[in-house]
Amino acid sequence: MARVKRGVIARARHKKILKQAKGYYGARSRVYRVAFQAVIKAGQYAYRDRRQRKRQFRQLWIARINAAARQNGISYSKFINGLKKASVEIDRKILADIAVFDKVAFTTLVEKAKAALA
């Protein structure tokens, strides 16, 4: 059986990993074995955090809506319930944007929600 020389493939694989680890601190960017572990872990963090980002943004939007709603004398849960009853279909992302940048429009939404609850 012919001898298989794998130097070229190994070099390419190492180069690929070290390229991915570029910018990492110390041995993590220079030593293949350490860099490989760092790249694998970074991938795990990235995978996890792509999912967490969606949750975190929703939390942020809810916190902003709640703060603005309470300034207008209504709690977040009652505000959302009022909007549902008034059949206002604005998602939390847009509501949070309105709460931050257009206080007058948000106040009118609060009034609609209060009217629907009454």
From Swiss-Prot:
GO molecular function: rRNA binding; structural constituent of ribosome
GO cellular component: ribonucleoprotein complex; ribosome
Keywords, in A-Z order: Ribonucleoprotein, Ribosomal protein, RNA-binding, rRNA-binding
Presence of keyword RNA-binding: yes
Any one of the GO BP annotations: ribosomal large subunit assembly
Family annotation (CDD domains): Ribosomal_L20
Pfam family for this entry, one: Ribosomal_L20
Domain of life, per lineage: Bacteria
PROSITE patterns given in the database record: RIBOSOMAL_L20 (PS00937)
Statement: the UniProt record of this protein carries the keyword RNA-binding: yes
Similarity-based family: Belongs to the bacterial ribosomal protein bL20 family.
Function field: Binds directly to 23S ribosomal RNA and is necessary for the in vitro assembly process of the 50S ribosomal subunit. It is not involved in the protein synthesizing functions of that subunit.
Name under which the protein is recorded: Large ribosomal subunit protein bL20
Annotated organism of origin: Shigella flexneri
Organism lineage string: Bacteria, Pseudomonadati, Pseudomonadota, Gammaproteobacteria, Enterobacterales
